[in-house]
Regions:
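Conserved catalytic phosphorylation-site environment of P-type ATPases
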Residues: 281, 340, 377, 387-464, ...
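Conserved cytosolic catalytic loops of P-type ATPases
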Residues: 37-58, 62, 224-317, 417-461, ...
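Membrane-embedded alpha-helical bundles of multi-pass transporters
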Residues: 123-134, 159, 178, 182, ...
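Bilayer-spanning, highly hydrophobic alpha-helical transmembrane segments
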Residues: 105-113, 339-367, 381-387, 396-397, ...
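Flexible metal-binding regulatory segments at protein termini and peripheral loops
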Residues: 1-131, 156, 224, 239-242, ...
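Conserved ATP-binding TGD loop and adjacent catalytic N/P-domain core of P-type ATPases
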Residues: 9, 26, 507, 535, ...
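P-type ATPase nucleotide-binding
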Residues: 443-571, 581, 593-611
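Actuator/coupling domain of P-type ATPases
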Residues: 63-78, 82-88, 115, 126, ...
Length: 739
C-alpha cells in the first residue's frame, strides 16, 4: 500500500459562480470533502471563492473543478497560470448586477400594478374573475421568467438533496402562484396572490442586487491594488529604449521611470534620483527621497526626477502582487467563529420549511375563515422572511472589508483566524533591534586597551566580522570601509549565534562578540568599559582583550507613541533583546517600557522559550520581530507580527505582516481586529435576532393581539433588507482609522 502522508499539500483558490446563501457554501464544501485527495476545503460566500488544500499526486485542478460542478456550480474563467481573468470576471459580474436590477425593477413594477388593482377593485370595470384572468399572464411572466434564477437553483439543490434559500423563495412564490392559478381556473371571485408572488420575486431580486453591489464595493480593494500596476514599462536593452507590456519584463532588465509614472517592478536605482510616493505601502503621503542604490517598489509613484532602475522582482513576484495575493487569501479564509455559524445555517433551511408547514397546518385547522388563504399567507410569509443569507454573510463580509482596510494601512493579515486572534491579545513582545530601533546601528566609540591603537582594533574587528551578516558586524565593517582601512583576509571563520564571531586574522585568533561569549571562553572582562545605551562589542586576540567598540542603534521616532498606544489598549508591553540589560533599560526608558518588562541578554534560541513562559502565566502573546532569529518566537507566539522590511523567514512565520517599519501599525492592527470582531458580533446578533424574532411573527404569533397576519410582500421586503443590512454594516469598516 502506498502512503501519501509525506506528499506536500498544494493549495488552489477558485472563483465560483452561482452561490446565493450559506447552504450553497455547505454543499460545495461537502462535495469537495468527498473528493479523493482533498485535505481541506473552505468556501467563502462574500468573495465567491473556494480555497482547497489537496494532495497533488491524488487530485489535480480539473478534479477539483469537477467536484464543484458536480455540486451544481461553475468555476469562473481562468488564465493558464490559474489566476482569475479579472477584467472578464468583473465584466461578467457587472452584467449580472445590471440584469438583477432590470429584472427587479420590472418584477416589482408589475407586482405593484397588480397589487393596486387587487386593493382597488372598483377602479376596473370588470368582475374579479376577469381581473384574475388578466393578471395570470404578467404573474406567469414574473414567476417563470424573472424568477427563473430561484427555480433553477432550487431544482439543482433538490437533485442533490439540498434545501437552500432559493428553495424557500421558490416554495413561497410557487405556493402563492399555484393557489392563485387554481382560483382563476375555477372562476372563483376569491382574492388571489398573483400580486404578492410578483412583488416577492421583485423585492428578493432587488435585495440580491443591493447585496451584490455592496459585495463589489467590499472587494474593491484588490482591484484598486492591481490598478496601481502600470501596463507597460520603458526597457533599456542593447542601448535602445522601448515600451514593453509589463508581462514581458525579466529580472535584470534596466528600466527608465519618468516623473508621474508608476514604478513597474521591484528593484533598485542604478542611475538618477527622485522622490517616490509610497503611500500604497505605508499610508504616508509625503514623498520619500531615493537615490542610486536605494530600493524601489513596483506600483509606487515617481513624483519628481527621472531615474534608471534594475528590475529584481517582476510579475507575480513583486511586492504589489504579493500584497494582493495575501489580501485575497485573507478575504477568502474563514475565521473560527464562522465554522460555528456554518453548523447552524446548515440546519436552518430544513427547520424553516418545517415551521412553514406547521404554520400552514395550524391556521388551516384553527385559523379564521377563510382558513386556506390565512394558512397560505402564514406559510408563505415564513418561507420568504427567513434569511440564511444574513447569517452566511455576517462573518465573511466583515473579514473581507477588514482585510482590505488593513492592506490600505500597510497591515497584511494572512487569514480570518489571525484577525480573530488579534483581538484576544493581552501581551505584546517587541524585539529590540529593527523593531523598536532602526536596525541600522553605527559605531560611536572605539576604546582600545593599552598596547593597541584604534586603527588596529578596528582593522582586526572588521576583518573578523566581514563574514557575518549581523547588523552590528555590518556597522563595524562599514566604519572600516569609511576610513579606508584595507582589511586582511580572515580564515577559520565561525559564527556563534547570539554571541559573536571567531576567525584567524594575521595568524592571530580573533574573537569579536558579547561580554557573555568572552566570559564563557574564560577571557577577563574587568577592564571593559561601555557607556549606558551603547552595545559593547569586545575584541580579543589570542585570548587577551584588546579593546571595545561602542555601538548605538537609534530608537525609531514613532516607537514611544506606539508603546503608549499599546498601553492605552490595556496591553502588557515587553521588550526582548540579546543586548545587555543596561542598554535595554536605557532604550526601555526612552520608549516607555518598564524595567520589569524587559527580557535582556536572551540568545536567539531562547526567545521562543521566553514566549512560552509568558503563555504559561496565562498571557495571549503577540510577538513582533523582523529578523531570522525571531522566526521561532514568531511561530511560538499566539500571533506573530513581522516587520515587512525584515527577513523573509520572519514574514513566513507570522500571521500579520507590516509592510512598512512604522511600529504604530502594531496597535493599529490590534484595533482593526477589535473593530472587525465587533462588527462580526453585531452582524451575527442582527442576523440571528432577525430570524428568531420575525419568523414567529410571520407564522402568526401576534395574531391574537393584532388580528392580522404578516403580508408575504412585507416579508420579502424585510428579508431583502436583512442581508443588505449585514453587508452595509461591514462596509462601515472602510472608515476605520487607528486612534
Amino acid at each position: 500500500m502506498i502512503s501519501h502522508a509525506a506528499a506536500p499539500l498544494a493549495e488552489l483558490s477558485l472563483p465560483v459562480t452561482g452561490m446565493t446563501c450559506a447552504s450553497c457554501v455547505a454543499r460545495i464544501e461537502r462535495f469537495l470533502a468527498r473528493a479523493d485527495g482533498v485535505e481541506e476545503a473552505a468556501v467563502n460566500l462574500a468573495t465567491e471563492r473556494a480555497t482547497v488544500r489537496f494532495h497533488p499526486d491524488r487530485i489535480d485542478r480539473s478534479g477539483i473543478v469537477a467536484a464543484i460542478e458536480a455540486a451544481g456550480y461553475e468555476v469562473a474563467a481562468q488564465t493558464s497560470s490559474g489566476e482569475p481573468v479579472a477584467e472578464e470576471t468583473e465584466r461578467a459580474r457587472d452584467a449580472e448586477r445590471r440584469a438583477l436590477l432590470r429584472d427587479a425593477l420590472l418584477a416589482t413594477g408589475i407586482g405593484l400594478a397588480m397589487m393596486a388593482v387587487s386593493m382597488w377593485p372598483g377602479g376596473v370595470p370588470w368582475p374579479m374573475q376577469r381581473v384574475n384572468v388578466w393578471m395570470l399572464a404578467p404573474a406567469t411572466v414574473v414567476q417563470f421568467v424573472f424568477g427563473r434564477r430561484f427555480l433553477a437553483a432550487a431544482a439543482r439543490g433538490l437533485r442533490h438533496g439540498e434545501l437552500t434559500m432559493d428553495t424557500l423563495v421558490s416554495l413561497g412564490t410557487l405556493a402563492a402562484y399555484g393557489y392563485s392559478l387554481a382560483i382563476t381556473l375555477i372562476g372563483s371571485a376569491d382574492p388571489t396572490y398573483f400580486d404578492s408572488a410578483a412583488v416577492i420575486i421583485g423585492l428578493v431580486l432587488l435585495g440580491r442586487w443591493l447585496e451584490a453591489r455592496a459585495k463589489s464595493q467590499a472587494a474593491g480593494a484588490i482591484r484598486a491594488l492591481l490598478r496601481l500596476r502600470p501596463t507597460t514599462a520603458r526597457v533599456l536593452r542593447d542601448g535602445r529604449e522601448a515600451d514593453l507590456p509589463i508581462d514581458q519584463l525579466r529580472a535584470g532588465d534596466l528600466l527608465r521611470v519618468r516623473p508621474g509614472e508608476r514604478v513597474p517592478a521591484d528593484g533598485s536605482i542604478v542611475e538618477g534620483a527622485s522622490a517616490l510616493d509610497e503611500s500604497m505601502l505605508t499610508g504616508e503621503s509625503l514623498p520619500v527621497d531615493k537615490r542610486a542604490g536605494d530600493r524601489v517598489t513596483g506600483g509606487t509613484m515617481n513624483a519628481s526626477g527621472s531615474f534608471v532602475m534594475r528590475a529584481e522582482r517582476v510579475g507575480s513576484d513583486t511586492t504589489l502582487a504579493q500584497i494582493a495575493r495575501m489580501v485575497e487569501e485573507a478575504q477568502g479564509s474563514k475565521a473560527p467563529i464562522q465554522r460555528v455559524v456554518d453548523q447552524v445555517t446548515a440546519r436552518f433551511v430544513p427547520v424553516v420549511v418545517l415551521v412553514a408547514a406547521g404554520a400552514f397546518g395550524f391556521w388551516l385547522l384553527l385559523g379564521p375563515e377563510p382558513r386556506l388563504p390565512a394558512a397560505l399567507t402564514a406559510a408563505v410569509a415564513v418561507l420568504i422572511i427567513a434569511c440564511p443569507c444574513a447569517m452566511g454573510l455576517a462573518t465573511p463580509t466583515a473579514i473581507m472589508v477588514g482585510a482590505a482596510r488593513g492592506a490600505e494601512a500597510g497591515i497584511l493579515v494572512r487569514s480570518g483566524a489571525a484577525l480573530e486572534q488579534a483581538q484576544r491579545i493581552t501581551a505584546v513582545i517587541l524585539d529590540k533591534t529593527g523593531t523598536i530601533t532602526s536596525g541600522q546601528p553605527s559605531v560611536v566609540s572605539l576604546r582600545p586597551l593599552a598596547g593597541t591603537t584604534e586603527l588596529e582594533l578596528l582593522r582586526l574587528a572588521a576583518a573578523a566580522e566581514r563574514g557575518s551578516e549581523h547588523p552590528l558586524a555590518e556597522a563595524i565593517v562599514r566604519l572600516a570601509a569609511g576610513r579606508g582601512i584595507e582589511l586582511p583576509p580572515a580564515t577559520n571563520f565561525l559564527s556563534v549565534a547570539g554571541g559573536g564571531v571567531q576567525a584567524t586574522v594575521d595568524g592571530r585568533r580573533i574573537v569579536v562578540g558579547s561580554e557573555r561569549l568572552l566570559i564563557e571562553q574564560g577571557v577577563s572582562v574587568d577592564q571593559i568599559e561601555v557607556e549606558d545605551g551603547q552595545t559593547g562589542v569586545l575584541v580579543v586576540a589570542d585570548g587577551v582583550s584588546i579593546g571595545t567598540l561602542g555601538i548605538a542603534d537609534h530608537v525609531k521616532p514613532e516607537a514611544a507613541e506606539a508603546v503608549r498606544r499599546l498601553h492605552a489598549a490595556s496591553l502588557e508591553v515587553w521588550m526582548l533583546t540579546g543586548d545587555r540589560m543596561a542598554v535595554a533599560e536605557a532604550i526601555g526608558a526612552e520608549v516607555g517600557i518598564a524595567p520589569d518588562r524587559i527580557l535582556a541578554e536572551v540568545r536567539p534560541d531562547e526567545k521562543s522559550a521566553k514566549v512560552k513562559e509568558l503563555q504559561a502565566r496565562g498571557a495571549v502573546v503577540a510577538m513582533v520581530g523582523d529578523g531570522i532569529n525571531d522566526a521561532p518566537a514568531l511561530a511560538q507566539s499566539d500571533l506573530g507580527v513581522a516587520i515587512g522590511t525584515g527577513a523573509d523567514v520572519a514574514v513566513e512565520a507570522s500571521e500579520i505582516t507590516l509592510v512598512g517599519d512604522d511600529l504604530r501599525a502594531v496597535p493599529a492592527a490590534i484595533q482593526l481586529s477589535r473593530a472587525t470582531m465587533r462588527t462580526i458580533r453585531q452582524n451575527l446578533a442582527w442576523a440571528f435576532g432577525y430570524n428568531l424574532l420575525l419568523i414567529p411573527v410571520a407564522a402568526g404569533v401576534l395574531f391574537p393581539l393584532t388580528g392580522w397576519l404578516l403580508s408575504p410582500a412585507l416579508a420579502a421586503g424585510a428579508m431583502a433588507l436583512s442581508s443588505v443590512s449585514v453587508v452595509t454594516n461591514s462596509l462601515r469598516l472602510r472608515r476605520f482609522r487607528a486612534s
